[in-house]
Amino acid sequence: MESEQPAAVKASAPIEEPQSTETAVELGKHSTLKADLSIDKLETATTEATNAVVEPVEMEQQVENELVNESTQAMTSTTTQEKVVGSVNNLVEEQQCVEMEFETSSDLVVQGSPSEESKKVASDASATVTAPQVQPAPHVDSSPQASGLSLLAAYSSDDSDDEKVTPVQNGDNDVIEVPVTDPASSTTAYRPVVAVSSDDESSKSSSSSSDSDSDSEGEYLTVLRKKIDKRINTVDCDEDDEDFDEDGATGDRSRRRQPPKVRGEMLLDDLPPIHQLEITVPEDECVELGKVQSIVDQLVLVSVLPNSMLFDLDTVLFLEKGRKVLGEVFDVLGQVSDPLYCVRFNSNKQILDRGIKIGDVVYCAPKTEHTQFVILSKLMQVRGSDASWEHDVEPPARYVDHSDDEEEREARAEQRKRRQRDRTNSTDSVDTVTSVATTATKASSVAPPPRQRGRRGQRESFRQSQRPSINQHNQNQPQDEQYNFHPSYNPGSWHSNYYQNYHQAAANFNMAQQHPGMPFPVPNYGYGMPYAMPPMYPHMYPPPPPFAPPPPNNQSHQGQPPPS
């Protein structure tokens, strides 16, 4: 009996836990009231059990049961007080967490409680309570807020009940669904989806059951859809959106999508139309060039045979051995060894009308004026550049950089020579340049050789010092052009008058001898053979030559009397 009664008390304790928060003063009083209630319940339960079991039993057992009941009541009172205090503390902590969540988010979910005690919430802890009565908590709106399951249910119900988007029968791409990213609706579990139609009459905007302004979003997306349609379907991408109609129509122009282009670039449709050529060439002048490889829109691509001649633009190609004209070469693609010649037409329909098919044999006439060859020298003069200039076009020639270091050096050297040439022509003459060059050559020739060391160097230096003196002595002794006479010989002296064949003796030892034994040339009189000069005498006048005729006007000296 004693072991079973506390278990019954413990089993009933958690059923009676309060669901509301109270102050510290109210906790004690309220706990006493609950303890009394629990004791009364236990007493009634135990008395009923004992009365049912112990009717034929003696009074002694009843006394013992009463003692046991008193002890169990004391134990249950203490345990219930402890449990009530613990449950109240837990409820206070839970209430604080709920208040924090209520401040952070506006959507607070309040679930209803089945018991009346859970609806009683204690007032503020700072308020003083005089009477042991429980004050109800402030009324909280318990209307169902937007939670995850409720939003999902609302989303599924909106599709069927609230609003329906009318389908558009214009086409598959007329309706688009764009998710709206609105910061006001970011707290919801999903983003509203708006259906937009490109047609003005059928353009309607709809959103899910959110409080955001769906009308403004629908109008904005409708305008955006129109702009997208205009951009896709227009031909000229550079024109503004205001230049087109409201529904994006462009008149008679084609609505096909055009490739991107830069400013100033012309597409195939922008080029002037091609006039059909009526040319025929003899069959013997035609040479097979290749075949029609493919047809792309309004271009015919011709592949050539290996090791064939290279042709330039505007070369006329033929079909059927010269009897039919294919067209002029519009562009050349591919490698130099295996080029592809492009022939342009006005439209693809024109190609079909002329009966041009893939695999047709193409001919050329290299001996006629309709063929343009590639000249390598002219091709090398064309300078291309990979650099991008304004509007993604190639830069002009004056802005092209050199692609090779050697070319850059050659160009700089040529510019340097040109500047030097211009400077020379403007300041100095050709004679001045020649004189400067001659002076530089002489200076380089007069420059002494490198000096040597040792005894050999001393001998060479002595010889070099003696050579200039000898040369200077020879230059200072001028010689007669006709005779190699002594410099002191004077042909206008009286000796020449009386002695025309007189020659002064070689008494001057300063005169250098030309030939050993022959100081003077052979005289033109007497013997024709050379002979030695007569010895010198110590008188002033030498004797006359032995076989010479007497001098004129000097007969008195010969023993004859003077004329009377």
Curated annotation (Swiss-Prot):
Biased composition (Acidic residues): 238-249
The keyword Acyltransferase appears for this protein: no
Compartments it resides in: Nucleus
Keywords: Nucleus, Phosphoprotein, Ribosome biogenesis, RNA-binding, rRNA processing
Region: Disordered, residue numbers: 1-29, 108-218, 238-264, 387-489, 538-564
Modified residues (Phosphothreonine): 250, 427, 432
UniProt feature, compositional bias: Polar residues: 468-489, 554-564
rRNA processing among keywords: yes
Biological process per Gene Ontology, one example term: pseudouridine synthesis
Molecular-function GO terms, alphabetical: RNA binding
Biased composition, class Pro residues, residue ranges: 538-553
Bias (Basic and acidic residues): 388-402
TM region positions: none
Superkingdom of origin: Eukaryota
Subunit structure of this chain's protein: During assembly of the complex, component of the box H/ACA small nucleolar ribonucleoprotein (H/ACA snoRNP) complex.
Family per similarity comment: Belongs to the NAF1 family.
Protein name, UniProt field: H/ACA ribonucleoprotein complex non-core subunit NAF1
Organism: Drosophila melanogaster (Fruit fly)
